[in-house]
Amino acid sequence: MKERKFFGTDGIRGKVGSGQMTPELALKLGWAAGRVLSRSGTKKVIIGKDTRISGYMFESALEAGLSAAGLNVMLMGPMPTPAVAYLTRTFRAEAGVVISASHNPYYDNGIKFFSTDGSKLDDNLELEIEAELEKPLVCVESHLLGKVSRIEDARGRYIEYCKGNFPAEHTLTGLKIVVDCAHGATYHIAPAVFRELGAEVIAIGDKPNGMNINDKVGATSMGKICETVLAESADLGIALDGDGDRIMMVNSKGEVIDGDQILYILACDAKSRGVLRGGVVGTLMSNLGLDLALQALDIPFARSKVGDRYVMELLKELDWRIGGENSGHILNLDHGTTGDGIIAGILVLAAMRRQNATLEELTSAMEMLPQVLVNVRFEGEHDPLKSDKVKAVQAQVESQLGLRGRVLLRKSGTEPLIRVMVEGDDHSAVLAHANLIADAVKSAS
């Protein structure tokens, strides 16, 4: 496949005002996408965004470009990424566009597209859009310009969709839940969803100002929610990231429940109800404890490359339904086409209600093995992973760890780093093993 110049694995992303994330590029991108998408379908595109201050600028530029290509645009305002995917399907739009940089700081932003079925846009269509970007922008004639409108009830539609994923025979009455919205796109949705299902909700990270998204709150910064769960004597906490496609949870003891543990809960619940299709897809970074816990239940487990895009690809290849990353991207293809933090939280709460169990009880049979990650910076064009010394040290460590341990060495896709990950039963031994391999990588650099 031809190498892509603009699109990465999750759309276009970068620092606002530099590189690709400029209003000029957004305008041209809207026009180029409009040219490609107008060749078939309804000529209707939905745009949603998170709460970054730059989102308004990019929204205006994109809608102008799409209109100039003859496409009608429907604006949603601040809405979670999975909400854009859902409403793209229900409105039978030709595509959905999300303006977000997910868990990144406010000064970054990004643009990604969903196809008409709510899945990530096909690689070939992205290549066609890139080809159009190389051409001069030519506006359609005035009578062919696209119209721009707003979806006034987008919030209500998505809240009802989320609630529809919770079993009708149960409620959340009696549960006290802390919900951290990361000052992001779920701020006006997630607390309402859980309140309307009956829970007492304490919302934090629900006051976006355009520049505080993901700032010491949300799924990538768990300190605040852990403190709040303990201070409020809450039953659990749900932390979402800036665009709502990622979730981490907290039990009543203030302990973090990560994506691997959430996958375990969902797989166990599905198996107990006889609805588990196949097994579970994790990634190369998934904790070995998840693998071993699923083995004990005779649930197959497979690993993809890191990234929810690759989890989705392997799920489709195996025809399985449940997969995700330890970072909190959770996919359940029976309940959506993309990662959805609110839906994942609802499914965990449903499992708690069905089994009349606490979050601690649902994860008690899964032992998370100590995992140490060391980043080693290197210089030059050579690959330290090809070093005989590094290979020898890795083999030595793997031999000592046996079946209750794991070593993973991989290059960062964005920085000159080698990521050294070691898992095993004993934290001090795992740390020593990781440092031993890291030293070998440094000496080979």
UniProtKB/Swiss-Prot annotation:
HAMAP family: GlmM_B. Keywords: Isomerase, Magnesium, Metal-binding, Phosphoprotein. Activated by phosphorylation. This is Phosphoglucosamine mutase. The lineage of its organism: Bacteria, Pseudomonadati, Pseudomonadota, Gammaproteobacteria, Alteromonadales. The active site is at residue 102. The modification Phosphoserine is found at residue 102. One of its GO terms (biological process) is UDP-N-acetylglucosamine biosynthetic process. Mg(2+) binds at residues 102, 241, 243, 245. One of its GO terms (cellular component) is cytosol. Catalyzes the conversion of glucosamine-6-phosphate to glucosamine-1-phosphate. It comes from Shewanella sp. (strain W3-18-1). The keyword Isomerase applies. Belongs to the phosphohexose mutase family. Its cofactor is Mg(2+). It catalyses: alpha-D-glucosamine 1-phosphate = D-glucosamine 6-phosphate. GO terms for molecular function: magnesium ion binding; phosphoglucosamine mutase activity; phosphomannomutase activity. The keyword Kinase does not apply.
